[in-house]
Amino acid sequence: MEIIQKFGLEAKLFLFQLINFLIIVFILKKFLFAPLKKILDERKRKIEQSLQDAENAKIALENASEKKKNILAKAKSSADTLMATVKVSIKETKEKAVIEAKQRSEQIIDEAKQKAATEFESMNKKIGKISVDISGKVMSKVLSDLFTETEKQKLMSRALEKIDENIKN
């Protein structure tokens, strides 16, 4: 104890200071350190949660970017397929229209040929009738002086028959 007294320490005073120190430590621990630790722990938890959310957002962004690329690739592929289908359809439609136009033009040409042939035949018949009439008149004038009436009739009928045969052939 002598050593303690040499340093100037008094046991009672030291004991009171020790009790005061323990009371202050208890009060600080109870009312300051506990709430402060709680606030710091809550802040640490929020920071960790924010970091985790940021990491999740980064992963979600990467996934969205990949999905976007996949969707764009599918859309491009679909558009290319659709364009190819449209081109084929247009080509088929064009070819079909050309074929139909050719068939229609051939049909029109055939109809025109038939009409021309019918018209030609009709004109030939008319010309034949006119030539028979003219021939008959010419023959009756020419033959009127040379032959009798019955001979003229026979000759005329034979001549007209031959002309009719020539026209029909």
From Swiss-Prot:
Function: F(1)F(0) ATP synthase produces ATP from ADP in the presence of a proton or sodium gradient. F-type ATPases consist of two structural domains, F(1) containing the extramembraneous catalytic core and F(0) containing the membrane proton channel, linked together by a central stalk and a peripheral stalk. During catalysis, ATP synthesis in the catalytic domain of F(1) is coupled via a rotary mechanism of the central stalk subunits to proton translocation.
Entry-linked PANTHER family: ATP SYNTHASE SUBUNIT B', CHLOROPLASTIC
InterPro entries: ATP_synth_b/b'su_bac/chlpt (IPR002146), ATP_synth_F0_bsu_bac (IPR005864), ATP_synthase_B_chain (IPR050059)
Gene3D superfamilies noted in UniProt: 6.10.250.1580
GO molecular function term, any single one: proton-transporting ATPase activity, rotational mechanism
Coiled-coil regions listed in the entry: none
Entry's family note: Belongs to the ATPase B chain family.
Recorded superkingdom: Bacteria
Topology of this chain in the membrane: Single-pass membrane protein
Cleaved signal peptide residues: none
Lineage, opening ranks: Bacteria, Pseudomonadati, Elusimicrobiota, Endomicrobiia, Endomicrobiales
Bilayer-crossing regions: 13-33
Localisation per UniProt entry: Cell inner membrane
Protein name listed in UniProt: ATP synthase subunit b
One Gene Ontology term, aspect cellular component: proton-transporting ATP synthase complex
